[in-house]
């Protein structure tokens, strides 16, 4: 962008701002949106959804895109069964979190114990909508049109520094309060985007999705 075009762009933006009265520029309160999402989450015993996950890391080149089906059962069971790359799994069985990714690290599975208290557990959605007023500062971004309705977009920043991310922007469906998209800025430098479709709430989840038995010959690495 040249200096002249940059100045022209700033002048145009200033003209737009001056055309609206201050009341039109007042930031919308994000908390009613988050309260709606939190209330909805409390009614969910189990959930499943198709997911597309994109992880971008400028240090390693092109973004990595994966797909599959996500499962959740409160309070501490969570799973991601990947169809691309096929065979990869993430399983939280209530006691352990299993990370099995033969597509990148064949011959091993990483196992870590789930803390019994003090966290939401390995819960992709719940970490953002359980007690959000206690855990985050929030800013309303804008509304967005979805294929099946409208979503409100809110950016969250953790109040404490012990989270593995510095910010998360979430899309909350206006009609039912379900989270449909998450863009997470991780402290590792990665940006992770997860988009959920075909959400099914309280329709039951097969118990096998929350169990993991290491295949023969696979080494268990405890962390």
What kind of feature is each model-predicted range?
Residues 69-121, 192-195:
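An acidic-aromatic
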Residues 44-46, 65-67, 73-75, 85, ...:
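Extracytoplasmic
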Residues 108-110, 124, 133-223:
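Gly/Pro-enriched, hydrophobic low-complexity segments
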Residues 1-10, 23:
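Bacterial N-terminal signal peptides that target proteins for export
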Residues 51, 78-81, 97-100, 156, ...:
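Short hydrophobic/aromatic-rich beta-strand segments that constitute the beta-sheet cores
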